[in-house]
A protein has these predicted regions:
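Short S/T/G/P-rich N-terminal loop/turn motif that feeds into the first structured element of a domain
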Residues: 1-49, 53-68, 76-94
Length: 94
């Protein structure tokens, strides 16, 4: 089942997002298993929405690429961990 993730970074900025994206998305391509990615400024920070082909592919990306890079620090990137909401995707349109 497809799996959705919403990450919110309170106080986050476009510049911080761009730094993180460059560090975790190789050559501007989606990670293996990721079907959709969108991001933008929200009321009090920066929000990222992703859909993976399964919960397992999300966990693999999160545990082996995203969170280790965020924890070690990305120059110019977000300085706090995201607030995370996850869900099983009922409907995804192209």
């Amino acid at each position: 089942m497809k799996y959705g993730i919403v990450h919110h970074f309170p106080g986050g900025t476009k510049a911080q997002y761009d730094a993180v994206l460059k560090a975790v998305h190789v050559k501007d391509k989606l990670p293996e298993g990721q079907l959709f990615h969108a991001a933008g400024q929200s009321a009090d920070g920066w929000t990222v929405i992703a859909v993976h082909d399964s919960k397992e592919s999300w966990e693999r990306f999160r545990d082996t690429i995203l969170m280790p890079r965020l924890k070690q620090g990305i120059s110019g990137g977000f300085t706090t961990p995201p607030q995370e909401t996850t869900f099983e995707v009922h409907n995804l349109k192209p």
